[in-house]
Design a protein with these regions (language model features):
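Walker A/P-loop
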Residues: 17
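P-loop (Walker A) phosphate-binding loop of NTP-binding proteins
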Residues: 11
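Short beta-strand-centered segment that lines the nucleotide-binding/catalytic pocket of NTP-utilizing
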Residues: 29-41
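Conserved phosphate-donor/acceptor-positioning beta-strand/loop module used by diverse small-molecule
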Residues: 94-101, 114-138
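Hydrophobic anchor at the beta1->P-loop junction of P-loop NTPases
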Residues: 8
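Small-molecule kinase domains that catalyze NTP-dependent phosphoryl transfer to phosphate-bearing small molecules
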Residues: 140-232
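ATP-binding Walker
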Residues: 14
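ATP-dependent small-molecule kinase phosphotransfer cores
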Residues: 38-103
Length: 236
């Protein structure tokens, strides 16, 4: 069976990581751990949520051709090292990856170059839902900072600035550059969901699995057709 990568993209707060976690925890998917140059947030663990490295190390990895995809968002680099999918592919289980839309294009190229199957998904939500989720996330992060922490003020400011930056990024960039193209006739995505939450969770998961099956069958048919044509060629 060909390796499968399911790429999940969408605006901040749409539920990309939530979908990836469900596929991983309940449906035997493996999740790629991305690499980033941004600092860890409260509660994030190196090697679990991200591989946290400095800018020079990231750029060196890129220069050596060691990245599947990379993006630059809010002053930080994000990417996936080639070693991650190649390692996970040995387990013969589908792989899920959360990426920005530009990163999805790069993953699609990686899959095409390596003869892998790719399913690209875009998860959206109404703008008011996105903002509400980010505000709730910010509130939770702020509550996790202990008041007796010597760096309390700095951490509060960092969390606040980061989340406000993400909210502004949604309004000023993501809606026009990510959401609108996802719904266009030239969309790069196989599946686009207007919203993802507990109410439609089962339906979304079923559609993702159906799309994987459809692409697997398509690959099988191509393989069979190629084999038949090969057998029809008579030697001179």
């Amino acid at each position: 069976m060909k390796p499968i990568i399911v790429s999940v993209a969408g605006p901040s707060g749409a539920g990309k990581s939530y979908l990836a976690n469900i596929l991983k925890q309940n449906h035997s998917f493996q999740e790629i751990v991305s690499t980033t140059t941004r600092a860890p947030r409260e509660g994030e663990i190196n090697g679990v949520h991200y591989h946290f490295i400095d800018k020079d190390s990231f750029l060196k990895l890129e220069e050596e051709g060691g990245l599947v995809e990379k993006t630059y968002v809010n002053g930080n680099y994000y990417g996936v090292s080639k070693s991650e999918p190649l390692r996970l592919a040995k387990e013969n289980l589908p792989i899920v990856l959360v990426a920005e839309p530009e990163g999805v294009k790069q993953v699609q190229k990686f899959c095409k170059d390596n003869d892998w199957i790719n399913v690209s998904i875009f998860v959206n939500s109404p703008i008011e839902v996105l903002i509400d989720r980010l505000q709730s996330r910010m509130k939770q992060e702020l509550e996790n900072v202990k008041k007796d922490d010597p760096q309390y003020e700095q951490k509060i400011k960092k969390i606040t600035d980061s989340n406000i930056g993400r909210m502004n990024h949604i309004k000023e960039f993501e809606l026009k550059n990510w959401v609108e193209p996802a719904y266009s006739k030239d969309s790069i995505f196989d599946l686009v969901f207007d919203e993802f939450n507990k109410k439609n969770e089962v339906d979304v998961i079923n559609k993702v699995k159906s799309e994987i099956s459809r692409k697997q069958k398509l690959e099988d048919n191509i393989k069979k057709t190629s084999k038949v044509k090969k057998n029809r060629i008579k030697p001179f």
